[in-house]
């Protein structure tokens, strides 16, 4: 017997916790009925609320789940509180009941009508109806939802009636109100009623307001009535006043009142279309006992039962004793001896029931089952979501570029752990902070702050990796570029390989990035709008570019919600919950280059003015500090991440976004909206707010924002009404105090911080409070157990409990986003070990530089983690990484072996060849014949590869079904290797092993394009080609072997392998009897004969010097020994075997041809193949002639030992790659791993996932270093101050006043460290005059001068003059010939008359002016003069002059070719002299020590020479250019000096000169040319030989040659040095005073004379020019403006002035290549014939542009698909040569 009791009050547990846990369980797939009930109950309640009058409907807030109402105290204590509590009680009953049965698989829902009765009190009685009507558990959601709706209507009616008896106060007091019922113990109902009648008659109480008995039991009586009358009763009545009485928690009104309610009220409650429809389907099954009589209700339909129950609740008093009597009577009437009482926690009625069972039925055993207890039990096994909408979201990968040098999460954590505040002045690569900053806020368009937090070198980008041309990269927003880079890194960390699993289906991966500005497009690229202005600048292209590059077909969203954009993008998890995608890449981006935004935010009073990141929660917080940042995260549903074997960094439990609609202004935060959001998000996540132990707050450092946020946080997570225990501390922090406010990336940055905190188990110190805490913060934070971590605080894992945190991210536009994040579960240790003995580790890259970097990083990782599992490493680098065209694969069995092999590849990386871009090589399967393996094998593949084992066992089953014995003993190692099995077993084993191997290779993605089988192997080949089924192949092999055993004598004949050609054999053996069985190769032949005949042959051939090996076979195949079986074998084959057309070409060693048709292979063919010779040599040669095979193919030997591939290598002149499947005597896994590595490096795309699948449960993804990018800077510098002026003149007067010695600055778009201001310029069609002025005291210029110190003075080196010349030359060419391209500049005839020395007083300016004049640009010459400017603004006579001669770098390269071998010869001679101890070999440190001691002390960045070999006045040096940043240059002086100052070194250090008495300085050179750019970090070699001149022995001349990779790429020709006595050093090189006109240099040759050059001055070049001037043709090709930028990029301006120049060849193909190079921003050297245009960044847009240029300039009409039809440079050249030569 069963009794289910439903109470009229909630269990004494924490009600909110019960509902929260039920909500969490409803997401579990084990509770589908529970989830359905909550959904249907929610819908039912919504329908009821919608039907209310407007006034009542407004009292119920919107709710997403019926359970959410439990947290709404205001509603539950309001007018409809009784209705809501009734709903919640019924919902709790039914949900708990459903969950109880779903949680326990042993419990069955078996409430039968015979032995079950249902009882309940008050609202609990309604819950019994749902059970009574439900024949199964699956019906409870429907009946339960109906009960919920009726419970609500009951509550509304009760409220309506009760309000008429005693209205609620107009101003509600805190709390639920007064009680409508009191219980009086130890009295009789008769006494109570008598007293009530006496008082109410005396007071003439109106009938509806009378107090009445609503419930009675053996121990007490309950009286009910309006609260005021109840209070009056207990006040005026001595009877009641003197007795103990207790108010019950009945606050919603009256029930059990027959004098108030009638049938009308009952009908109002049960009138429902839902009830009518249910009545037709459901009928009462289980008896429900009346609480007034104890007898079952008599209703026969659902509606009748509801009517009876509602009438009972409204009009009948509760008499629990009657209910107990009814239950006891049913127990007596039944045959049961025990009773299960189902309860919702124990209670007084339950105790009374059990006590009665004990007294009245002593032989009857009654026990309780608590239906609530299951709710709090831990899940075992772990919960699985019932659907995608219920999934948790795993974060499986992250990458970042954040301020403070945080180029990865580890560096970011270092910054946080150190408590750094990484603000700094706005760097020069963004804009000139000095000119764009005004602390007083008075200047138009200026920023009020000079500070921010910035990414280092945001222009760094590996353009070729992402198939972008340099030009496209330059014009593409760095936010887009870095989003690409970090997305790749995050995906790499996550081990995401598209299409590896269902969750990584490329069609189901989407991207979601937050971005709130387009700075680079608005400022940088807007200076020069070109092809990629839209695609590179508009933010929608950022996520789209990621999808396009990775070939993801899911959605791509760019999200802009202002400051919360990034975390709003993290709500990509909503797409995961909705099932729109399986994997999401989400994040935020922000790179600040637009000074307008600084000015706008300053004027809006958003920004702090003080030098700090955000002063979060500080008393003086005055705004936020802007910040860069790029973050990418990879998200998956948790169950998918676990199934994919991912590393889980954290788990998102819930995310939500709302808006502060009620704020006082759009930008003002609103604590109420924030609190509502976080409360809702936490509740949806199923988390108790007190389980949150950390909140990463938005915390921008504004007074209003910080104060409002702490209010919302304390309200939800640390309220006064409910206190946290001492074990529930809550910490708060904000990453903005460290790295500033990244705006659109601030949310993802905070999330990365949180994930690192989980990982490091620590909370970093909060560094935002610089003085004292914000006075608006609550003063009782400590009492609330809420803490700010002023120092790093441990945050350890707690066994059995998860750390949970909240991340807040709010928007200045009013949006609020909150995310609940839980730490990942600790992964269970692997249960076993990977049985494979050898593991394949791969490394790949898209360039040699990156390959080298990746190898170095992996080696460093293995050295730092010597215990790393090689199996894990192999799994990570193969199955969990993308693979590129530069590939390295290493099969290793231990770490030492791995490091050694990786080191070997690292040494040879420069000669590494990438895989061809033409696609995968075709594959040939070559099937081995008999005799290659041991008689017995022990195949590790059979033991450890489930796939191979299953294939082999299936084939064995086919063999046994045909009557053959099992061949498994041949391969399973159950016998010694030498054990001889029957020929049938051996031959079946061979063929079946080969078939299984072929299928195994195919499972790994290696499918044959051609097959060839040797002897017995041909049967396996025919099967793989589709000619034979596996069953037929086994049948033929087995029958043939059986016939051989029956009709041929084992051992009577032999086969002899001879290392000789057939012709050689014939010439030696003459007429001795033998047969030729196999012609395997040019010198590989197999003979057959009787044992005696073979013995003679062996003796003769060995005597002739030929190696002979007797094959270990039972029969002499392909010889006369097989004649007895041929007829029968052919007949059996004809009758039983079905031959199908081949689906692959078959190379036939029998016929010596390639088989394509369906008729050739038949019974006759296999008969002949048994008897006739195998002509493997002839077959391969024919196949090659027919082009069936070629040198590109990959050969795989399918068999027990490599034989055929050795034959192939001896036949073909070149074999791409040839690998075995198994090698005799070698562990199978070692062979397979090595072969897979070779195939991988040959370009085959392998199914690595399948290779590791069987072992994956024992494998883990290793957190390896990320890809080593081959970065170069691509950056368009914002030039000038046009963002300030915007065409206005309001700054002109200010500039003139600040610089009285200069003209008003004209608006030029050029500014570098040495060319700071164009003060005058005049341009005509072909002539120009430009005058620039610079202050030597500016930091970068001064630092460059002090980098070259002589006599303790900063001396402007000639390389600085060269940089000025390059800058002005480029500027003039751009102005006069804006479309020019590929023009180099020769800085010729430099003559320095006075040294320029930095003054000591840096407080005063030290100006110089340089004038540049071009008479006719088409003559290709410009003339420059340098002048000092005195303090009064007067310009001195020129102290230096030079010419710029424009020319073609290609011509220069050609002109240097004849000298190359001479220079190389001299270098080699110096090397030999050094080895002989004659020449001096000096290290880097020694060379510069000597240089500094003798004359010049160079700064570190100038010290490029790594070693010097010197003999007398001849030397060469190996040079590496620095990567150190600093300054804006066209050609950094320290680059020029590093490759050129070898000449000065020789003159001032060589023992051929008397350096003790003399020193040497250069007055100039004849020519300086660089045909290729000087690039940071690259290596060069300089060579010079200085020779004294005949005219003056104190003057020396020489040519400095600069080589790269053995090619001369630059020259400083006719460089001159003059020798001076050392006693003059102090006189010549001393710092001047502030008036530079008084300074006289060592080379002063003329008296001071004031010279002011006007715009009309004409200078005639009379000096001999070192190279022929180039006539500049009319501009034709559009190209980007040459802009000096950061050092790494700008060097290109030296050799490439983006202009159309005649090329050296007149062919259309050559012109076309030059045009392609120009359009893509490439060098011609970047266009080898095998270069793929797609990899060079030639996309569809560029294709259209180039096609148009071809038409306009070359007269070649093509369409935009040209580069698809001719994908490589060689293809296009060939086409152009064929049709346009």
Curated annotation (Swiss-Prot):
Enzyme class, first EC level, given as a word: transferase
Annotated segments matching region Malonyl-CoA:ACP transacylase (MAT) domain: 925-1244
Domain Carrier: 1703-1780
EC number, as in UniProt: 2.3.1.-
Region feature (N-terminal acylcarrier protein transacylase domain (SAT)): 15-253
Active site residues per record: 563 (for beta-ketoacyl synthase activity), 698 (for beta-ketoacyl synthase activity), 741 (for beta-ketoacyl synthase activity), 1348 (proton acceptor), 1537 (proton donor)
InterPro entries, per the entry: Ac_transferase_dom_sf, ACP-like_sf, Acyl_transferase_dom, Acyl_Trfase/lysoPLipase, Ketoacyl_synth_AS, Ketoacyl_synth_C, Ketoacyl_synth_N, Malonyl_transacylase_ACP-bd
Coiled coil: none
Record SUPFAM superfamilies: ACP-like (SSF47336), FabD/lysophospholipase-like (SSF52151), Probable ACP-binding domain of malonyl-CoA ACP transacylase (SSF55048), Thiolase-like (SSF53901)
Ranges of residues in domain Ketosynthase family 3 (KS3): 390-823
Residue segments, region Disordered: 1633-1653
Alphabetical keyword list: Multifunctional enzyme, Phosphopantetheine, Phosphoprotein, Transferase
Region described as Product template (PT) domain: 1312-1631
CDD domains cross-referenced by the UniProt entry: PKS (cd00833)
Domain of life: Eukaryota
Positions of the UniProt region annotated as N-terminal hotdog fold: 1316-1451
Listed pathway(s): Secondary metabolite biosynthesis
NCBIfam families the UniProt entry points to: PT_fungal_PKS
General function of this protein: Atrochrysone carboxylic acid synthase; part of the gene cluster that mediates the biosynthesis of the dimeric xanthones cryptosporioptides. The pathway begins with the synthesis of atrochrysone thioester by the polyketide synthase dmx-nrPKS. The atrochrysone carboxyl ACP thioesterase dmxR1 then breaks the thioester bond and releases the atrochrysone carboxylic acid from dmx-nrPKS. Atrochrysone carboxylic acid is decarboxylated by the decarboxylase dmxR15, and oxidized by the anthrone oxygenase dmxR16 to yield emodin. Emodin is then reduced to emodin hydroquinone by the oxidoreductase dmxR7.
UniProt comment concerning the protein's domains: Multidomain protein; including a starter unit:ACP transacylase (SAT) that selects the starter unit; a ketosynthase (KS) that catalyzes repeated decarboxylative condensation to elongate the polyketide backbone; a malonyl-CoA:ACP transacylase (MAT) that selects and transfers the extender unit malonyl-CoA; a product template (PT) domain that controls the immediate cyclization regioselectivity of the reactive polyketide backbone; and an acyl-carrier protein (ACP) that serves as the tether of the growing and completed polyketide via its phosphopantetheinyl arm.
PANTHER family referenced in this protein's UniProt entry, alphabetically: FATTY ACID SYNTHASE (PTHR43775), SI:DKEY-61P9.11 (PTHR43775:SF37)
Identification of the protein by name: Atrochrysone carboxylic acid synthase
Organism: Cryptosporiopsis sp. (strain 8999)
């Amino acid at each position: 017997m069963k009794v289910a009791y439903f109470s009229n009050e909630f269990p004494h547990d924490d009600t909110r916790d019960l509902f929260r846990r039920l909500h969490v369980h409803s997401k579990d797939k084990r509770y589908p009925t529970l989830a359905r009930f909550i959904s249907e109950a929610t819908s039912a309640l919504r329908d009821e609320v919608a039907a209310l009058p407007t006034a009542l409907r407004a009292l119920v807030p919107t709710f997403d789940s019926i359970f959410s109402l439990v947290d709404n105290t205001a509603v539950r204590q309001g007018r409809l509180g009784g209705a809501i509590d009734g709903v919640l009680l019924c919902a709790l009953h039914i949900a708990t009941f459903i969950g109880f049965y779903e949680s326990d698989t042993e419990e069955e829902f078996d409430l039968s009508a015979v032995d079950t009765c249902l009882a309940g009190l008050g609202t609990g009685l309604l819950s019994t109806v749902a059970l009574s009507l439900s024949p199964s558990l699956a019906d409870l959601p429907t009946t339960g939802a109906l009960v919920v709706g009726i419970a609500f209507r009951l509550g509304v009616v009760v409220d309506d009636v009760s309000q008429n008896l005693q209205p609620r106060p107009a101003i509600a007091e805190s709390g639920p109100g007064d009680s409508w019922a009191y219980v009086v113990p130890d009295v009789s109902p008769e006494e109570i009623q008598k007293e009530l009648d006496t008082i109410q008659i005396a007071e003439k109480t109106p009938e509806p307001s009378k107090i009445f008995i609503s419930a009675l039991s053996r121990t007490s009586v309950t009286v009910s009535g309006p609260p005021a009358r109840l209070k009056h009763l207990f006040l005026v009545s001595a009877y009641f006043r003197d007795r103990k009485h207790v108010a019950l928690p009945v606050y919603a009104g009256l029930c059990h009142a027959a004098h108030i309610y009638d049938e009308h009220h009952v009908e109002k409650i049960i009138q429902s279309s839902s009830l009518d429809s249910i009545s037709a389907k459901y009928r009462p099954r289980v008896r429900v006992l009346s609480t007034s009589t104890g007898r079952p209700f008599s209703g026969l339909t659902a509606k009748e039962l509801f009517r009876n129950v509602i009438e009972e609740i409204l009009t009948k008093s509760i008499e629990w004793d009657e209910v107990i009597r009814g239950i006891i009577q049913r127990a007596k009437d039944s045959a049961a001896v025990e009773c299960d009482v189902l309860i919702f926690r124990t209670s007084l009625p339950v105790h009374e029931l059990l006590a009665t069972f004990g007294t009245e039925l002593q032989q009857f055993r009654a026990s309780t089952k608590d239906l609530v207890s299951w709710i709090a039990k831990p899940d075992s096994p772990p919960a699985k979501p019932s659907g995608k909408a219920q999934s948790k979201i795993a974060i499986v990968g992250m990458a970042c570029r954040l301020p403070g040098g945080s180029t990865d999460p580890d560096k970011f954590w270092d910054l946080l752990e150190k408590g750094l505040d990484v603000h700094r002045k706005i760097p020069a690569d963004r804009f000139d902070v000095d000119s764009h900053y005004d602390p007083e806020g008075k200047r138009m368009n200026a920023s009020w702050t000079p500070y921010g937090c910035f990414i280092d070198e945001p222009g760094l980008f590996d353009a070729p990796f992402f198939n972008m041309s340099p030009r496209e990269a330059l014009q593409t927003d760095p936010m887009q570029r870095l989003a690409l880079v970090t997305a790749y890194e995050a995906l790499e960390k996550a081990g995401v390989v598209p299409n590896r699993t269902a969750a990584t289906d490329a069609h189901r991966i989407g991207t979601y990035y937050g971005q709130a500005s387009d700075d680079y497009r608005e400022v940088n690229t807007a200076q020069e709008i070109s092809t990629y202005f839209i695609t590179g600048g508009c933010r929608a292209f950022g996520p789209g570019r990621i999808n396009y590059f990775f070939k993801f077909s899911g959605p791509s969203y760019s999200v802009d919600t202002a400051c919360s954009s990034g975390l709003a993008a993290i709500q990509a998890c909503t797409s995961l919950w909705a099932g729109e995608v399986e994997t999401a890449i989400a994040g935020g981006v922000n790179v600040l280059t637009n000074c307008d935004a600084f000015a706008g935010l300053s004027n809006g009073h958003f920004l702090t003015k003080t030098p700090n990141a955000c002063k979060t929660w500080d008393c003086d917080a005055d705004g936020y500090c802007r910040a860069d940042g790029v973050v990418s995260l990879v998200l998956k549903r948790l169950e998918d991440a676990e199934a994919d074997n991912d590393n889980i960094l954290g788990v998102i439990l819930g995310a939500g976004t709302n808006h502060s609609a009620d704020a006082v202004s759009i930008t003002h935060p609103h604590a109420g909206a924030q609190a509502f959001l976080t409360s809702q998000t936490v509740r949806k996540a199923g988390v108790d707010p007190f389980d949150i132990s950390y909140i990463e707050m938005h915390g921008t450092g504004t007074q209003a924002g910080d104060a409002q946020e702490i209010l919302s946080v304390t309200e939800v997570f640390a309220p006064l009404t409910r206190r946290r225990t001492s074990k529930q501390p809550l910490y708060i922090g904000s990453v903005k105090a460290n790295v500033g406010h990244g705006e659109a990336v601030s949310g993802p940055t905070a999330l990365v911080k949180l994930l690192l905190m989980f990982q490091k188990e620590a909370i970093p110190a909060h560094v935002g409070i610089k003085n004292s805490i914000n006075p608006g913060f609550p003063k009782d934070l400590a009492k609330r157990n809420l803490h700010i971590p002023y120092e790093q605080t441990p945050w350890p894992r707690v066994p059995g409990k998860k750390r949970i945190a909240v991340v807040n991210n709010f928007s200045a536009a009013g949006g609020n986003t909150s995310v609940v994040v839980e730490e990942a579960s600790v992964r269970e240790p692997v249960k076993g070990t990977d049985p494979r003995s050898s593991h394949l580790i791969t490394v790949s890259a898209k360039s040699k530089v990156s390959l080298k970097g990746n190898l170095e990083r992996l080696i460093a990782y293995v050295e730092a983690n010597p215990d790393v599992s090689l199996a894990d490493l192999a799994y990570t680098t193969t199955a969990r990484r993308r693979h590129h065209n530069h590939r390295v694969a290493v099969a290793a069995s231990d770490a030492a072996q791995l490091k050694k092999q990786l080191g070997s590849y690292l040494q040879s990386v420069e000669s590494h060849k990438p895989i061809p871009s033409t696609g995968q090589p075709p594959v040939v399967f070559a099937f081995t014949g008999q005799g290659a393996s041991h008689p017995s094998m022990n195949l590790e593949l059979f033991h450890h590869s489930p796939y191979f084992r299953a294939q082999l066992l299936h084939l064995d089953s086919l063999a046994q079904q045909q009557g053959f014995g099992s061949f498994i003993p041949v391969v399973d190692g159950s016998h010694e290797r030498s054990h001889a099995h029957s020929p049938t077993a051996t031959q079946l084993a061979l063929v079946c092993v080969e078939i299984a191997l072929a299928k195994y290779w195919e499972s790994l993605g290696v499918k044959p394009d051609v097959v060839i089988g040797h002897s017995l192997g041909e049967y396996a080949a025919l099967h793989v080609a589709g000619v034979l089924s596996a069953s037929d192949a086994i049948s033929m092999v087995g029958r043939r072997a059986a016939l051989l055993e029956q009709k041929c004598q084992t051992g009577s004949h032999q086969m002899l392998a001879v290392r000789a050609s057939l012709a050689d054999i014939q010439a030696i053996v003459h007429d001795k009897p033998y047969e030729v069985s196999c012609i395997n190769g040019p010198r590989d032949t197999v003979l057959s004969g009787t044992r005696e005949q073979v013995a003679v042959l062996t003796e003769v051939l060995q005597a002739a010097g030929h190696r002979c090996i007797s094959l270990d076979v039972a029969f002499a195949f392909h010889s006369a020994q097989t004649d007895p079986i041929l007829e029968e074998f052919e007949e059996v084959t004809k009758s039983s075997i079905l031959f199908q057309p081949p689906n692959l070409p078959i190379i036939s060693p029998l016929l010596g041809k390639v088989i394509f048709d369906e008729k050739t292979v038949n019974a006759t063919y296999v008969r002949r193949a048994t008897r006739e010779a195998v002509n493997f040599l002839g077959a391969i040669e024919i196949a090659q002639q027919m082009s069936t095979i070629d040198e590109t193919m990959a050969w795989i030997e399918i068999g027990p030992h490599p034989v055929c591939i050795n034959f192939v290598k001896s036949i073909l002149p070149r074999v791409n790659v040839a690998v075995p499947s198994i090698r005799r005597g070698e562990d199978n896994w070692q062979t397979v791993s090595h072969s897979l590595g070779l195939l991988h490096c040959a370009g085959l795309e392998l199914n690595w996932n399948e290779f590791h699948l069987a072992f994956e449960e024992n494998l883990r993804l290793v957190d390896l270093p990320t890809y080593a990018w081959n970065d170069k800077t691509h950056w368009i510098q914002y030039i000038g101050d046009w963002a300030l002026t915007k065409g206005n003149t309001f700054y002109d007067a200010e500039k003139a006043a600040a610089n009285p010695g200069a003209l008003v600055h004209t608006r030029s778009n050029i500014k570098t460290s040495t060319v700071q201001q164009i003060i005058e310029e005049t341009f005509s069609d072909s002539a120009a005059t430009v005058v620039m002025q610079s202050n030597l005291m500016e930091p970068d210029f001064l630092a460059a001068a002090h980098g070259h110190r002589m006599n303790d003075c900063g001396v402007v080196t000639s390389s600085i003059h060269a940089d000025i010349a390059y800058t002005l030359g480029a500027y003039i060419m751009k102005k006069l010939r804006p479309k020019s391209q590929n023009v180099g500049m020769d800085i010729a005839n430099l003559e320095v008359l006075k040294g320029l020395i930095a003054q000591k007083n840096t407080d005063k300016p030290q100006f110089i002016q340089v004038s540049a004049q071009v008479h006719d640009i088409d003559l290709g010459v410009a003339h420059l003069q340098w002048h000092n400017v005195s303090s009064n603004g007067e310009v001195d006579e020129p102290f230096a002059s030079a010419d710029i001669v424009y020319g073609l770098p290609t011509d220069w390269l050609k002109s240097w070719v004849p000298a190359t071998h001479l220079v190389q010869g001299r270098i080699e001679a110096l090397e030999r002299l050094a080895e002989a101890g004659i020449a001096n070999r000096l290290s880097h440190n020694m060379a510069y020590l000597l240089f500094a001691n003798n004359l010049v002390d160079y700064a570190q960045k100038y010290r490029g020479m790594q070693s010097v070999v010197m003999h007398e006045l001849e030397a060469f040096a190996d040079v590496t250019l620095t990567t150190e940043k600093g300054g804006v240059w066209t050609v950094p002086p320290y680059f020029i000096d590093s490759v050129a100052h070898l000449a000065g070194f020789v003159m001032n250090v060589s023992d051929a000169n008397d350096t003790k008495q003399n020193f040497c300085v250069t007055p100039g050179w004849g020519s300086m040319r660089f045909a290729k750019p000087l690039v940071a970090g690259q290596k060069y070699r300089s060579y010079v030989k200085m020779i004294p001149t005949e005219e003056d022995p104190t003057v020396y001349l020489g040519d400095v040659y600069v080589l790269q990779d053995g090619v001369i790429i630059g020259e400083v020709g006719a460089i001159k040095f003059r020798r001076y006595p050392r006693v003059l050093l102090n006189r010549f090189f001393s710092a001047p005073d502030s008036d530079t006109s008084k300074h006289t240099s060592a080379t002063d040759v003329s008296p001071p004379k004031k010279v002011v050059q006007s715009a009309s001055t004409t200078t005639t070049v009379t000096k001999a020019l070192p190279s022929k001037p180039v006539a500049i043709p009319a501009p034709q090709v559009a190209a980007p403006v040459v802009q000096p930028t950061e050092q790494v990029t700008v060097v290109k301006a030296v050799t490439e002035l983006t202009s159309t120049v005649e090329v050296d060849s007149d062919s259309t193909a050559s012109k076309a290549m030059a045009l392609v190079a120009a359009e893509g921003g490439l060098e011609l050297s970047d266009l080898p014939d095998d270069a793929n245009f797609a990899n060079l960044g030639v996309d569809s847009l560029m294709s259209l542009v180039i096609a148009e240029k071809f038409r306009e300039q070359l007269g070649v009409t093509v369409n935009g698909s040209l580069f698809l039809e001719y994908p490589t440079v060689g293809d296009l050249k060939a086409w152009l040569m064929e049709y346009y030569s």
